[in-house]
Swiss-Prot record:
Function, as annotated: Catalyzes the attachment of alanine to tRNA(Ala) in a two-step reaction: alanine is first activated by ATP to form Ala-AMP and then transferred to the acceptor end of tRNA(Ala). Also edits incorrectly charged Ser-tRNA(Ala) and Gly-tRNA(Ala) via its editing domain.
UniProt organism field: Rickettsia felis (strain ATCC VR-1525 / URRWXCal2)
InterPro entries: aa-tRNA-synth_II/BPL/LPL, Ala-tRNA-lgiase_IIc, Ala-tRNA-ligase_IIc_anticod-bd, Ala-tRNA-synth_IIc_core, Ala-tRNA-synth_IIc_N, Ala-tRNA_ligase, Ala_tRNA_ligase_euk/bac, DHHA1_dom
Protein name (record): Alanine--tRNA ligase
Name of the gene this protein is made from: alaS
GO molecular function, one term: aminoacyl-tRNA deacylase activity
Domain-related comment: Consists of three domains; the N-terminal catalytic domain, the editing domain and the C-terminal C-Ala domain. The editing domain removes incorrectly charged amino acids, while the C-Ala domain, along with tRNA(Ala), serves as a bridge to cooperatively bring together the editing and aminoacylation centers thus stimulating deacylation of misacylated tRNAs.
């Protein structure tokens, strides 16, 4: 049997099926594109789910993939076993071939058997198969194609060999292929009491989708039968490399050996498990970050944080005191970056996120471990750690519950889950009460009461700029009132419906006017509470307003239009950032104002000037193309079917708004937008900056505000031209000449200062103060460059063998200290020590330097009056 590398196994599988007319489909993101029911892609068929159900058509009916997959949440949570068993992983690759109404059982079995025995050269006597106990058709094909007798075809009655997509939908029997590692390894055949051993390992699973489950009692034949298969790359490689543990294959060993070279701990004993955990979790963390997941305390981000912190704890066990994971990333990119180019594209970003998270957790890890050690000192095997302590570790020290359990695993100590969950619920309740009790607490509670009594506010603003609405609540000074009578009173107004957009999704709220038969009201802002109550922030301008009255609500159309153009530009910008900076870019926050937009993204380094220019060009090209902006209300289900992104963890109403801009962007969005991209006019980035680790902020303007910006810049340019008496064609030359002349003048001034500070030996003898046989020159000089002072002081100490020079200069409440000592006396007087002591005396943090020359700082100018006394004391003691 030939020995294959991991890369060769993957390549041969794909090449084999491509040669058999299968289309090679690239791996999808770990984040399911259209499936809020899944946290992560956990199998090869996920990206084809809609194809299997008939909701989507592809230009091919046979496919082959190598799909990156992750199981570390929900029912597929293998985290606690990873590193300790031979085959559990968080991240793994699933090889698969698929048929959508083309071939079925016989051909699928033939393809599998031929690949395994001819291409991979597996011994036939090492292979066994299972079939569903009623699937005689599959059994007969195994006999025909593989020549198996009944004793090598194992019939399984359980649902392990019958797959379904859910309570209803496509389903069918499975056939699994097992490899026998040999009798020297414990384990029994599938279906026996010893089946959980490691001797017989499943290497391939084939699902024959031939039925549709109508309800729990009704199952019918599908008119179009399909094939879904999965082969774990790591398992198959282990077989082909003659090892029984996935962590012993070449890919993992490369990472493990690379790690050993850094931490310098032998791969043996308990350390072996830590190396395996780190290798697995490095892959999972890196691929998740590459696909846009950032460590956080909720959703996918929290799963990533759990994985990373488990790896960090094992790095700590290996004695690694500094961040480790990011140092291993280059090896992973080298091993897998060619197959998954997203790793290469996002390498610097992944590296920065790994390092930042490790630094963050290092600060609490040791303290948390100390607490855990103290709390478990009296616990023995079979005991239980209290839920309160587990929660404290989670809440105070950032220990995910499964990390605490992992630490206690070897001691056979469990955690009181029930009490832990009670503590979690209590915290959520405290948070809710705290929220209700913070700020305008009385008003906060009112939103719950209003929603319970009146329900949600109906938003009319997608189609109407003004509408007749009924006043249902008025709030003044945090209290519900029946009417508002005092002119210029500020209050909150809620109506049954409104064309005013309440601030949400980053878009600021509308402004405008409300008119009733007796009043005129200015709306200065519109807010949204509890996700669905639209609240108008108002000022009474004329008359009075009462609950129950009808009024005409009219938005400021110009203000709304400016919001529209900046919101639509944000969508285009997001799409272009993906193209220019990479697929790792995810939205971390946004603000859509009438005069500008702000967009925060995950990106670990500054966006270059060249990238900014390219982004602007691409956004403006899409604007000029004048694509239609289709804003459609539909059900969430229909939106997802059309390909709109459904974000995991987001709660959507039964009706959502899908915003489509040509072929550029398709997003679920509740905001307001232009009708065509050309309505935006133009786009200009005004600033780019860092706001947090791994997060950049882009600000931009659109339409008339670009023109305004250009006019301001043009006006500034003309003012500069006028001041410098030049024109724009010669401006750069003029400025460069001025800068060059300024440098020359600075050098000349430096010479003047040096000459002014220079003293002859006779002048030194005359001006210096004698202290215990050494000469001291001290001077305080306003606003002089440190470089000049350093040079001047050093020049003097070279002229006289027993001289100490101390210069202090002040600028904006900051003091700079320069100390120079003649080299002949540096055995007794150290410039660094003198500078440090003076710095501390003047409120600085100390300083230092060479024995003959040192500089330091201070900020207490008031103590300068006593500085000579301090100097005398220092030199007398010396």
């Amino acid at each position: 049997m030939t020995k294959f590398t991991t890369e060769e196994v993957r390549s041969k599988f794909i090449t084999y099926f491509k040669a058999n007319n299968h289309t090679h489909v690239p791996a999808s993101s770990l984040i399911p594109h259209n499936d809020p029911s899944l946290m992560f892609v956990n199998s090869g068929m996920v990206q084809f789910k809609n194809v299997f159900t008939g909701q989507e058509k592809r230009p091919y009916n046979k496919a082959v993939t190598s799909q990156k997959s992750l199981r570390a949440g929900g029912k597929h949570n293998d985290l606690e076993n990873v590193g300790y068993t031979a085959r559990h992983h968080t991240f793994f690759e699933m090889l698969g071939n698929f048929s959508f109404g083309d071939y079925f059982k016989e051909q699928a079995i033939y393809y599998a058997w031929n690949l395994l025995t001819k291409e991979f050269e597996l011994p036939k006597d090492k292979l066994y198969v299972t079939v569903y106990h009623t699937d005689e058709e599959a059994a007969s094909y195994w006999k025909k194609i593989a020549g198996f007798r009944d004793d090598r075809i194992i019939r399984i009655k359980t649902n392990d060999n019958f797959w379904s997509m859910g309570d209803t939908g496509p389903c069918g029997p499975c056939s699994e292929i097992f490899y026998d590692h040999g009798e020297q390894i414990y384990g029994g055949l599938p279906g026996t009491k010893d089946e959980d051993g490691d001797r017989f390992i499943e290497i391939w699973n084939m699902v024959f989708m031939q039925y549709e489950q109508i309800d729990k009692d009704t199952r019918i034949e599908l008119p179009q039968k399909s094939i879904d298969t999965g082969m774990g790359l790591e398992r198959m490689t282990a077989v082909l490399q003659h090892v029984n543990n996935n962590y012993d294959i070449d890919l993992f060993q490369e990472i493990i050996n690379f790690t050993e070279n850094i931490v310098k701990v032998k791969i043996e004993g308990e350390a072996k498990f830590s190396y395996r955990v780190i290798a697995d979790h490095l892959r999972a963390s890196s691929f998740l970050i590459a696909d846009g997941v950032i460590p956080s305390n909720e959703g996918r981000g929290y799963v990533l944080r759990r994985i990373m912190r488990r790896a960090m704890r094992h790095a700590h066990m290996l004695g690694s005191k500094e961040p480790l994971m990011y140092k291993l990333l280059p090896k992973l990119v080298d091993l897998m970056g060619n197959v998954y180019p997203e790793l290469k594209r996002a390498e610097s970003f992944i590296s920065s996120i790994l390092e930042q998270e490790e630094i963050r957790f290092k600060t609490t890890l040791e303290r948390g471990l100390k607490l855990l050690t103290e709390e478990t000192e009296t616990l023995t095997k079979g005991n239980e750690l209290s839920g309160e302590i587990a929660f404290k570790l989670y809440d105070t020290y950032g220990f995910p519950l499964d990390l605490t359990e992992d630490i206690l695993k070897n001691r056979d100590i469990s955690v009181d889950h029930k009490r832990f969950e009670e503590q979690m619920l209590a915290q959520k309740e405290r948070a809710r009460k705290s929220w209700l009790g913070s700020g305008e607490s009385k008003t906060d509670q009112l939103w719950f009461d209003i929603k319970e009594q009146h329900g949600s506010t109906e938003f009319l603003g997608y189609t109407l700029n003004e509408a007749e609405c009924k006043i249902i609540a008025l709030i003044k000074d945090n209290n519900l009132v029946n009417d508002i009578k005092e002119i210029d009173t500020q209050f909150l107004l809620i109506s049954n419906q409104t064309p005013f957009y309440g601030e949400s999704g980053g878009q600021m709220g509308d402004i405008g006017m409300i008119f009733s038969k007796d009043s005129e009201i200015e709306v200065i802002d519109t807010l949204k509470y509890l996700g669905s109550i639209i609240v108008h922030k108002c000022i009474l301008k004329k008359g009075q307003i009462k609950i129950g009255e009808n009024a005409n609500f009219s938005i400021d159309i110009k203000y709304r239009q400016n919001l529209r153009i900046h919101h639509s530009a944000t969508h285009i910008l997001h799409a272009v950032l993906h193209e220019v900076l990479g697929k790792h870019v995810t939205q971390k926050g946004s603000l859509v104002a009438p005069t500008y937009l702000r967009f925060d993204i995950s990106h670990s380094k500054a966006v270059t000037n060249e990238e900014i220019t390219l982004i602007e060009d691409k956004v403006n090209e899409i604007i000029r193309d004048n694509h239609e902006v289709d804003t459609t209300l539909m059900t969430t289900e229909d939106a997802v079917k059309q390909g709109a992104m459904a974000l995991f963890g987001e709660k959507y109403d039964s009706e959502v708004r899908v915003v489509k801009m040509g072929e550029t962007s398709l997003e679920l969005c509740g905001g307001t937008h232009v009708r065509r991209t050309g309505d935006i006019g133009c786009f200009k980035i005004t600033s780019e900056s860092a706001i947090a680790a791994g997060v950049r902020r882009i600000e931009a303007v659109c339409g008339e505000f670009v023109i305004k910006l250009m006019r301001e810049k043009d006006s500034l340019l003309k003012s500069i031209e006028s001041s410098l008496k030049t024109n724009k064609n010669e401006l750069i030359t003029k400025v460069n000449n001025i800068l060059e002349r300024n440098k020359e003048l600075e050098k000349e001034l430096e010479k003047v200062h040096l000459a002014r500070l220079d003293l002859s030996i006779e002048q030194i003898e005359k001006q210096a103060e004698d202290i215990k046989g050494v000469k001291l020159i001290y001077r305080y000089i306003e606003n002089l460059d440190n470089k000049v002072l350093r040079q001047a002081a050093e020049n003097l100490t070279k002229k006289v063998e027993d001289l100490i020079v101390v210069y202090i200069t002040g600028n904006n409440d900051k003091l700079s200290i320069t100390v120079a000592v003649s080299k002949a006396i540096t055995d007794k007087y150290k410039a660094g020590i003198i500078a440090k002591e003076l710095s501390l005396f003047l409120g600085g943090s100390g300083g230092g330097g060479q024995a003959s020359l040192a500089q330091a700082g201070g900020n207490d100018i008031g103590k300068l009056t006593n500085i000579q006394e301090k100097l005398h004391g220092l030199l007398t003691v010396s």
